[in-house]
Amino acid sequence: MSYPAHVTDTVYRYDGTFQGFLCCIFESYSRKEIPAAVCAHDRGQISFYDSCEIVTDPARAQRVARGLERLGPTVKERITTGFLSDDPEHELILLRFARICFEKGPAAARATGDPDICAAFDLERAVNNEACKYIEFIRFEQRDMMLGTVIHPKNRILPLLRGHFCSRLPDEDFMIFDATHGIAMLRRNRKVQYMVMEHYDKNTGQEELDWQKLWKRFFDAVTIEQRRNERCQMTHAPKRYWKDMCEMALLGRGTAGKAKQNAKAAR
């Protein structure tokens, strides 16, 4: 889709915050240009292009945020959700998407035949899909008078997990640690905060291990060996999630599998 702006060889560098990204959109709009790339400072990418430092200005960010509100929930959610992506080009994709929607109106978000619109749609879908998977597969353990767990997502999905688990566990304190990005979501006394965290020590107490063993035993007990289909299982629960699911640990594949092996040996 054509832009009322020229594509430059300039790289926008910003502080990595969502407010800072909104300021990148503002800068692009005011300069009537599309940058060659948009990079957060902490990524430290080497580029042969000229760089433009984008200073985070809350007033400018608020103006862009109000503009996104006027464009409607589809455009706004695609940008806010897509920003959680770990795709190295997600900022540029979303900036181009925002420019199109500001110029053409909210209906442009449905023009998925356009490569820029389609790329933004794919970002949002990938982030939402991963969040939905983790909502299904997260396994909490009891620790320090609260529930805790560690996950290894590709994208920064903690904000998308917040609503579900706060609603599902209204009276519980809990922590979800994103080991990939070193961020934890802590809910305590019905208040949620995000904090930088380097390491999560799993509960190795005997009581917790006994509960996990019972869950593994249940998982094995309900397995129907004649209908075991690991290819289908991996379609619904991809292997990359298994290390965070206690029933899928190597020790958890035991009871039914051993019974099958024993039956074969008996023959």
Predicted regions and their residues:
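Short, hydrophobic/amphipathic alpha-helical patches that form generic packing surfaces
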Residues: 20-31, 95-103, 163-167, 213-220
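Internal, well-folded beta-alpha domain core
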Residues: 106-199
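Long, compositionally biased intrinsically disordered terminal regions
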Residues: 173, 184-191, 203-267
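Charged, alpha-helical interface segments at or near domain boundaries
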Residues: 39-132
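Acidic, Ser/Thr-rich peripheral helices and adjacent loops at domain boundaries
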Residues: 53-60, 191-204
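Short coil/turn segments at secondary-structure boundaries
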Residues: 78-82, 179, 228-234
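N-terminal ordered "arm"
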Residues: 2-59
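Short, low-complexity, intrinsically disordered N-terminal peptides in bacterial proteins
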Residues: 1-7, 262-267
